[in-house]
Amino acid sequence: MDNKTYEISSAEWEVMNIIWMKKYASANNIIEEIQMQKDWSPKTIRTLITRLYKKGFIDRKKDNKIFQYYSLVEESDIKYKTSKNFINKVYKGGFNSLVLNFVEKEDLSQDEIEELRNILNKK
């Protein structure tokens, strides 16, 4: 997966979040979970599962004639690499520009400011 670009759609994130939460999930399990929150057809959800499988984000194993899907990527890794891709595209790789943009535009609480200071002090 290291040579992949980690391009993943918002809809694919929904599927990945369920797989990370459950560790192993059949297509029907994934469909049930998503349909509790979204009005997506089973066919749409199966298409998303197939895309993630073809992209190499998930794999499957047969368990009593039913495929159980599981993640091939750690949640923290894909979040990091997706964020890094975003920073490279939007901020030309300048992480400090990203942070500065958010700090200037967001109303941060004292707790959030203190948390940021603690994180930076650890570096």
Swiss-Prot record:
Q: Which UniProt keywords apply?
A: Antibiotic resistance, Cytoplasm, DNA-binding, Repressor, Transcription, Transcription regulation
Write one Pfam family the protein is assigned to.
Penicillinase_R
GO BP field: negative regulation of DNA-templated transcription; response to antibiotic
What is a single cellular component term in the Gene Ontology annotation? cytoplasm
Q: Which residues carry the site feature described as Cleavage?
A: 101-102
Ranges for region Important for dimerization: 74-123
Gene3D superfamilies, A to Z: Penicillinase repressor domain, Winged helix-like DNA-binding domain superfamily/Winged helix DNA-binding domain
Q: Taxonomically, which superkingdom?
A: Bacteria
Q: How is it modified after translation?
A: Upon exposure to beta-lactams, proteolytic cleavage at a single site impairs dimerization and abolishes repressor activity.
GO MF terms, alphabetically ordered: DNA binding
Self-association and partners: Monomer and homodimer.
Its family remark reads:
Belongs to the BlaI transcriptional regulatory family.
Summary of the function given for this chain in its UniProt record: Transcriptional repressor that constitutively blocks the transcription of the gene for the penicillin-binding protein MecA. Binds palindromic DNA with the sequence 5'-TACA-[AT]-N-TGTA-3'. Regulates genes involved in antibiotic resistance. Binds DNA as a dimer.
Q: What is this protein called?
A: Methicillin resistance regulatory protein MecI
Q: Organism source for this protein?
A: Staphylococcus aureus (strain N315)
Name the encoding gene, please. mecI
